[in-house]
Each structure stands twice: as structure tokens, then as C-alpha cells.
Amino acid sequence: MGLLAGLHRHDRLIVVALLLGVMLVSWLYLIAGMDLPMPAMDGMAMDGMGMPVAAPAWTATRFLLTLAMWLAMMAVMMLPGAVPMLLFYDSIAQKRSSPAIGRTLLFALGYLLVWLGFSVGAVVLQYGLDRAGLLSPLLRTTSTALSGAVLVAAGLYQWTSLKQACLRQCRSPLDFVMTQWRGGNGGALAMGLRHGVFCLGCCWMLMLLLFVGG
């Protein structure tokens, strides 16, 4: 039993170390991006006449860099809150079938895939707003009406039954595991996807406020 407990602790340390590594890399990417001529910042440059230079056209490179920025932001914002769920899942999976580190990592992968999907959607939305002339170089909406509508919608959404249902599953590891448990590797990935969807259901409107505040 002592050896088994030691293996469980070792697996949990690996999971925590990997999550911290992802968050650290994401933070470093965002910090480094502040000093790089990222496409989103090019529109802030001034030419010789003191006039702002227009932001560059959307290319595959700009899309990928913007996607990386969004994904890094999602990682640093959402992974810390997912750690308790991942560790709780790991402890339950260990009791059911040891070792479970592979399934725990599949759970984490499913969770991150949801936020990757959201990041792709955010880039598409950013592209649409930019093409419509509704986005400033600081990534803020230039339309007061649109900003107001997003703020009101985000506030109202907090009181909906959908938000509350998602919140119960997202913030309570015990409730989620008891109602959403799936066995095996495929089940671990599916649970990660489900947990990610529930957490996305809690936060997606709040994430859109990034377009209001920049």
C-alpha cells in the first residue's frame, strides 16, 4: 500500500508539473508578445507625420499568432481553476484502475480542446469585427452601441438557468464526477470535453468582454 500511495503521489506531481509548465509557457508567451511587433499592435505605430499606421492585412501568420495569443490567455485564466477538478479526477481514477495518469492527461487534453475551439471562434470574431471597422488597434470595439449590448448581455446571462447549470458542474468536482463519470481512455477524454463545455458555458460571455475593455 505504501508503494502504491507513493506512485499515486508521483502521478499527481507529474500532472501538477505539466499544468504549471503549460501555464508558465503561456505567461511567457504573453509577456514576450508585449515587446514583439505583433500584428495586433502594429496599428499603434506612428509614421513620420505622427499619424497611426493601419494594421496589417489578415494573413495565415497573423491568424496563427492571434490564435496563439487567445489560447495562451485561456490557459492562464482557465487552467488554475481546473486543477482541483483534474486532481480529484486523478484520485478517483487511481482507485478504480491504477495507474491513471494517462487518463488524467486525456481529461486535461479534452478540457484544453474546448478552449482551443473557443479561441478559434474568438479569432474569427476578431477578424469579422476588424473587417467591419468595429475594432480599434487596442482590440476594443469602436461602437458604443455594440459595447453596451455586450455588457448588458453579459450581465443578463449571469442570471439564466443555463449559466447556473453550467456553474454547478464546473465548480463542484464531486457533482461533476458523480453525474458525468465515463470509464476508460475514451471516457476520460469525453469527461474533459464535457467539463470544458460546462466551464465555457459559465465564462463565454465574460470572455467577450475582452473586446469591450481591450
Where would I find each of the regions flagged by the language model?
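Histidine-/acidic- and/or cysteine-rich, low-complexity loops and terminal segments associated
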Residues: M1-L71, K95-R96, L134-L139, T160-R182
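Juxtamembrane transmembrane-helix termini in multi-pass membrane transport proteins
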Residues: G2-A5, W58, L67-L112
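Divalent metal-coordination and catalytic microenvironments
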Residues: M38, M77, L109, V152, ...
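A small-residue-rich subset of transmembrane alpha-helices
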Residues: S98-G128, C202-G214
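Transmembrane alpha-helix/helix-exit interface in multi-pass inner-membrane proteins
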Residues: L116-L134, T144-S172
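Alpha-helical transmembrane segments of helical membrane proteins, especially in multi-pass transport
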Residues: G155-A165, G187, M191-V212
